[in-house]
Amino acid sequence: MSALDNKAVRGYIQKLVGDEGMAVVEKMIEKVPDQEVTDEQVAQISGINLNLVRKTLYILYENHLAMYRRERDKDSGWLTYLWKLDLDNSVHMLRNEARKLIKKLERRLEFESNEFYICQEEAPHRILFDYAMETNFVCPVDETPLMHYDNTAEKQALRNRIDDLKKSLAQ
């Protein structure tokens, strides 16, 4: 069973490397699972452009989903990079991303706890209570009265999303 069989892991990796990069990952899993290979070998095996293979491998490496080892050729002195996927780490990385998202959503929920007002005439942009009070609840653009904006639905959606993410982390 491959780590890519997990829909969440597949989606996470796809988000990182895109469709073309995903093809590189799939070919590596299919053709050279658990083996060290050069980027040139991956390009040759997969039929994918060498620059795209390298870009994908570097992105995976930066996200701790691939590793490499360097070997120096004794005759030429050139360095050869041997790459290997390490997708076992993907679930851990996905959990870290979920924790970051929870923090971001909690900050957004805190912001949404403010009171907002909107202009009836202008394009509906929200104005914080403090600024609305400074302008005597009159739109600074067209001088029409500001109306209270009820963001209860947004706050509830944020709470639901945070709860869902926390439940998924608890599993």
Curated annotation (Swiss-Prot):
GO biological process, one term: transcription initiation at RNA polymerase II promoter
Keyword Transcription attributed: yes
Keywords recorded for this protein, A-Z: DNA-binding, Transcription, Transcription regulation
Pfam families referenced in this protein's UniProt entry, alphabetically: TFIIE_alpha (PF02002)
InterPro entries given in the database record: TF_E_archaea (IPR016481), TFIIE/TFIIEa_HTH (IPR017919), TFIIE_asu (IPR002853), TFIIEa/SarR/Rpc3_HTH_dom (IPR024550), WH-like_DNA-bd_sf (IPR036388), WH_DNA-bd_sf (IPR036390)
Source species, domain of life: Archaea
Every HTH TFE/IIEalpha-type domain range: 5-91
Description of its domains: The winged helix domain is involved in binding to DNA in the preinitiation complex.
Family from the record: Belongs to the TFE family.
Function comment: Transcription factor that plays a role in the activation of archaeal genes transcribed by RNA polymerase. Facilitates transcription initiation by enhancing TATA-box recognition by TATA-box-binding protein (Tbp), and transcription factor B (Tfb) and RNA polymerase recruitment. Not absolutely required for transcription in vitro, but particularly important in cases where Tbp or Tfb function is not optimal. It dynamically alters the nucleic acid-binding properties of RNA polymerases by stabilizing the initiation complex and destabilizing elongation complexes.
Protein name: Transcription factor E
